[in-house]
Amino acid sequence: LSHLYSETLLAPGLGASFQWRHQNNGRDLLGVIDPESPVYATLRQSIERFENTVFELSLNKPNLIEWANSQDTLQDAADIRELRLGGAHAFQQCIELLQTMQMMTDRVEDPVRISAIHHSIGDVMGFIGQRSGSVHYLEQAALSYEQALEIRTQDDMPLEWAHSTYNMALVIHIIGRLEDDTGMLKQALGSIHKAVALLPRDDDTDVWAAAMSSAGTVLYQLGTHRRGSRTLQQSLVAFRNVLTERTAEKNKIAWAITQNNLAATLQAMGEHEEDIGSLEASIPVYDSVLKVLDRDALPLIWAMVSANRVSAMYSLAAESDYLDMAETSVAGFDKISKLFDGTEYVTYQAKAAERMQQAKELVASLQV
């Protein structure tokens, strides 16, 4: 399953649309490019440089170049940003190369190749659109996938059809998130379900699990948007299915993403349904993620999961009138806020401070 898109790490603690790219399956994009091309080596390096990068999904960042130059974790070397800056240029060059290849390839003589080129253009356009928050690029990506699907029919090329259908669903999902359009989220979910049905779970469990995880994420977002307990239940089922394939032994990072998202869904159910049991169940799941994550290697991820855990404690304290837990959540949000001291993540720090104030108000109300 070739794509460059990141996976969502649900972050209710700080209210962020937090994205994390870890899969590195964009290397398949190189399959349609001549290894002798000067773009080939640069693109290969660029795909690797964007691996394990994180960002917040938001509309209309200035451009991919500026995004790449500003990316860091809480502690990141300046030369890494420069490497990613060069990588951003490479993706722009890749589009030009693929479009040239598209013009030079005859659809009738080589339909398989032209469909792969359309699909690859979609991947790069979609990557730039997701990173920069550009709906224009995302719409161009969707158009490229549609062109690929004119050739990759479900009957003639079922697996390729599933790949392009799934990637187009990811693009639609991103647009839906950026524009707060539940109709597009529903459309994305329908396409993901169709693709998952044709993806070979036994032959490639990683691909199947990634697609099922995407379904769980969209269900969560729909469920929290309309406060739908049934939809959140479906999200829980999806994430639990993913965890039958994603284990900490196989892939620690993928497992951690899924465990966090499972906990966030339990937390959402507890908050929306005033269900103390679900809130209580979410906290040890967050704990299990924090025990596995390397705080020094992934400080921003660790901070997000920690904020989620504290927010679950806050919600449980509010629902159960637990004064001690409310006081613990004050200290927890204060600790999260201080993690961002001296960093560029002022928005996250401000949100943590805001949540700390809410927790203080809860403490005051419980002391009456």
Predicted features, each with a name:
Residues L43, L64-E66, A90-F91, P111, ...:
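Inter-repeat boundary and helix-capping residues of tandem alpha-helical solenoids
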Residues T53-E66, M101-I114, R131, A148-W161, ...:
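Flexible helix-coil transition and linker loops at the boundaries of alpha-helical arrays
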Residues N69-G86, R113-Q130, L159-R177, D206-T224, ...:
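Conserved alpha-helical positions within TPR/SEL1-like repeat arrays
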Residues P284-D287, D321-E344:
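TPR/TPR-like (Sel1-like) alpha-helical repeat modules
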